[in-house]
Amino acid sequence: MRLIRAHRALEVLPTATVWLIITAPVWGALVIPAALGFGLVIFSLYWLWKSLVFASGVLIGFWRLHNAQQRDWIAESLALPGYEKLHHLVIVPTFGESEEIVADTLHYLALQDVALERVSVVLAFEERDPSAPARAQRLSARFAALFQHFLITFHQDREGEVRGKASNLTWAARRVQAELIDTGRLDPIDLIVSVCDADSRLHHRYLGALGYEVLSQPNGFLHIFQPAILFYANHWRLIAPLRALNSIYSLWELARMVPSHRLVTQSTYSLSWRAVCEVGFWDVDVIPEDSHMCFKVLFHFGRRVKVRPIFLPVYADAAEGATLRRTLENQYHQILRWAWGVSDIPYVALGAVRARDLPWHVRIMRVVWYVEEHLMWPSHWFLLTLGGLIPPLVNPAYAHSTLGMWQSSLISAILGLCLPCLLLVILVDWRLRPQHPDGEDSIDVLIGWASFALLPIVGLLLCALPALDAHTRLLLGRRLEYRVTEKVPVQARFRDQQAAPAMKPLGKLAPLRRARFDQLPQYRAYAPGSTTAVTDAVLLVYRDLR
C-alpha cells in the first residue's frame, strides 16, 4: 500500500508542477511579479543554453552520421573474435499496417550487408487483427527464404496486459524461446535482438555496425544500442509546417545521441537476448516500452550497462493520414503517445532508489534528466510566448516599472541570441533531408525555410498541447490507450509524382545489398507497384546462391 501511494504521488507531483509552471505568468504577475520576472530571466538563460547544446549536437551528430555511413563495418568486424557466431534477430511488431508498409521494411532488411544466413526475422502480429493471417501468409511467401528463420507470431490479449507494443514484443520473444531457442535452432549466447517498427527502414550498414559495436566494447552484450531515427521517409508528402515540425523532431533525435551518457532508447533499438531474458522480457502493462525497457536493463545490470549511439539513420514515416485532418489528428496522437513517457517517472525514480549497483550520482542524474525532459516538453511553449505577453496585461503597473522594463528587455535580448542556433539547425536540415522527387526551385526552398516561422503555432498545437494532454490525463488518473499511428500505403505515397522512380537492375543479391543507401529513390529500395515482382526476383537469386 505504501508503494502504491508513493507511485501515485510521483505521478501527481510532476504533472501538477507543469500546471503550476504554465499558469505562473498569471498568478505570479499578481502575487510575486519581481520573482516571476527573475524566474523568466533564468528560464531564458536556460533556453539559450539548451539552444546552444541543440545546435552543437546537430552539427556533431551530422558529422558523425556522415562518417558512420562511410565506414566498412563488416571489414572492421572480421578481426574481432566471435564475429562469425553473431546472429541478429529482428522483431517487427505490427498492428493494422498494410502489407506494403511491412514489406518495405523487410526489403531494407534484405539490403543489410551482413550475411542473411545470420539474420532471423519475427513478424509479430496481433490476433485481434482480422486481416493479419492473410497478410502474414503473403509476407512469409515473399520473404521467408531470404533469412535464416522467418517466424510469424499472433499475440493473444491477456488479462493484466495493456494493448500495445510491449505486450506484443513479450509474446513474440516467448515464441522465439519456445520455437527457435529451446529446439536448438538458435544459440542464445550470441544472439542480438533489434526491435524495429513496421515503418522503419534500417540503413544497409546498421546490422554490420551493430555487430562491431557489440563485439568491440567491454560488456558489449549488456549494452543497449540506439540508431538515429529520422522522420524523413514521407517528408515531401506533408504540408510545409508539418515538414518543419518533423524536421525539428528528427534533428532533436540526432542531437540527443551526442551526449550518450543521458541517452534513452526510442522506437528502434537493439540489445542482446541475454539482457532481454535476464530482465524478464518487456513489461506487458506499459505503453512507453522503449524507454521503460532501457531503464529496466540499466537498473538490473547497473554500471556494466551503457546506452550507446550508432550514428546510422533509420528512416521512419512522420504521422500522416489520407486527408489533412487525419494527418493532424495522427500527428497529435503520436506526440500524445510519446509524451505518455511521463507515466514512467515513478518507475524511473523508484527503480533508481533500488539500483544499488549504479553510482549514486548516475542514478540521481538519470532521474533528473528524465524529469527535466518531461517537465519542459509541455511547459516551454507557454513560458517562451505567454511569459512575456500575459504579465504586462495582468499587472501593468509592475510592467512599466524600472525593474519590470529591465527584465523584459533582458529576456528579449537573451532569446534573440537563440535565433542563430535555429538558423544553423535549418541549414543542417536542408543538407540532411531527402531531395524533392521533382526537384526544388527557389520558390520551394523559400517556402521550406519560411515554414519554420510557423513553428510557434505548430509547436503549440502539435507539441505542447498533446504533451499537456498526457500530463493532465495522468494527473486525473485517466490511462492512455495505445493507438497505432496510421500509415499511408506505399503506393499512395507517390500519387503526386508523374511516374514511379526508376528501378535499377537486380544483378546478384550481394551487390544489391551493398548498393549505396542514399542513392535509393526517396530512401525506399523499390518502386511502388513493383515490390512483389522485386521480392520474387530477389528470392529466386537468393535461392540460387544458397
Q: What is the predicted function of each stretch?
A:
Residues 1-80, 424-426, 458-476, 486, ...:
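N-terminal membrane-anchoring/stem segments of glycan-assembly enzymes
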Residues 21-49, 369-476:
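Membrane-embedded multi-pass helical conduit in multi-pass membrane proteins
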Residues 519-526, 542:
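Low-complexity, intrinsically disordered or signal/transmembrane-proximal segments
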